[in-house]
Amino acid sequence: MLPAQKHTLETLLENSVKQVVQASKGDADAAFVLPAIALERPKVAAHGDVACNVALQLAKPLGANPRQLAEQIVAALTAQPEAAGLVDAAEIAGPGFINLRLTPASKQAVIGAVLAQGRAFGASERDHGKRVLLEFVSANPTGPLHVGHGRQAALGDALANVLASQGYAVHREFYYNDAGVQIGNLAISTQARARGLKPGDAGWPEAAYNGEYIADIARDYLNGETVAASDGEPVTGKRDVEDLEAIRKFAVTYLRREQDMDLKAFGVKFDQYYLESSLYTEGRVEKTVDALIAAGMTYEQEGALWLRTTDEGDDKDRVMRKTDGTYTYFVPDVAYHVTKWERGFTKVINIQGSDHHGTIARVRAGLQGLHIGIPKGYPDYVLHKMVTVMRDGQEVKISKRAGSYVTVRDLIEWSGGATPGSEGSPELLDEATITRGRDAVRFFLISRKADTEFVFDIDLALKQNDENPVYYVQYAHARICSVINEWKSRYGATDALLPGADLSPLDSKQAMALMQKLAEYPDVLAHAAGELAPHAVAFYLRELASEFHSFYNAERVLVDEQAPRTARVALLAATRQVLENGLAMLGVSAPSKM
């Protein structure tokens, strides 16, 4: 049911309920609160198209039999002239459920709506004028992006698209942790490589990173190469193995550039990159700490500065400043979120790994302790669990490039058909490989709820059959394109014939089911945005592809008779459009040929 139709039916039912309540109570209780009208899709198709339990909600306050109330509500509903175009039949089920069957014309209306709105179908202005800052990926610039970052990128970019579809002005932000201990480890790792050392050699630093990418950084530093991140100034290798600060600066910029390349291959763009180091150079960390001290939210104990996080629900107070004068890692996070608030983002969503769960209470406690108007529960979080990569039935734990983990680039190349063991080779980064790999990785990583662990099966991603979910959905789109092209070629037809087509021939069970599934798309987007659950779009696309295949296998589209032929092509055209729209939400291509 389309949103406008749903709103109309809710209004008609609300009017019906008012009539029944008025007849029962008269004007005796003007303060009586009517229950909200909730419409649901019955789990069993035989029970109708729409179910409503309002009679059950009214039974106790009215002291009436719910089945009798349901009968009265249905009588009042069908007596309204506007209901004739929507409601074909009504029945009372069980203790008092109202089950409604919609008219064929009301179901067929979705085709005209989709064809008229095109890529805008499903979008809403519900949240127009609202701003949201969405922070995701936010990897340390100490190595290539790993598969966990890939899951964040897929979730974050899809959620950004979904929120934008509901009218939000979305600001995508990447926070670079470029000021911690790990950056120092990166510098000494690169320095060791520049000195000719390798992992396992005498003198190799214990905290150093072992991946081959460190050797690449050291080589380019010694060769005097120039590197630049997308938002930064170019940095040239100084060739001095003793200048640790020059090495650090070059290595960080080198890896930021590499991460930019990975994100580009993944199809993810950011509006802003925010550097943790800027929080220190601009004095924001000290300012935040001073404000918390002034607010009485801290105390000194055993030479350390503690934050009273228990005042805000944490299980124990937390150290802010250690005895050596350095800050614990959540302190700059508090300062960073203050900047989000000061920039006018009253809604902020962070997508992070589930290992960050412990920092949520600390960051929120710090923000509350500042007493600057930040609401409780700020920011929102979407936490995702780990990704396990499987190939040939075995877990893949490391890659040649990273040394200790599988990278996003590995996953894109493997899923695109690159030869195992040759990851990172420039010749493999052709557009076809990137597109195939990106589509598979993005769809797979968003095809489960964020809070569930995910097994990424490379072998499944390479399959070209119905077992592969992204292939299944994309093939539905490509098959429709093929049928429509054949229709145009064989009959000299054009798209102009479709908007005004007679849709009455679309009366089969399969056609009705497909049209109802198309009409669900706007609600799917609204739900995905409201619940911060972009996986709902992936679920929906698989269901839509399934309904299409059921229809296509049951009914021949290009029949001799023009009326049913044009109607069926119109249904396919609408289905193709919604498949394209949904895939675009996930950042996945909609191929016309496969």
Curated annotation (Swiss-Prot):
> What are the recorded GO MF terms, alphabetically?
arginine-tRNA ligase activity; ATP binding
The reaction(s) catalysed by this protein are: tRNA(Arg) + L-arginine + ATP = L-arginyl-tRNA(Arg) + AMP + diphosphate
Q: What top-level class of enzyme does the UniProt entry assign?
A: ligase
Give the superkingdom in one word. Answer: Bacteria
Under the heading InterPro entries, the entry gives: aa-tRNA-synth_I_CS, Arg-tRNA-ligase, Arg-tRNA-synth_N, Arg-tRNA-synth_N_sf, ArgRS_core, DALR_anticod-bd, Rossmann-like_a/b/a_fold, tRNAsynth_Ia_anticodon-bd
Could you say which protein family the record assigns here?
Belongs to the class-I aminoacyl-tRNA synthetase family.
Q: What's the protein name?
A: Arginine--tRNA ligase
Q: Tell me which species this is from.
A: Burkholderia pseudomallei (strain K96243)
The protein's gene is named: argS
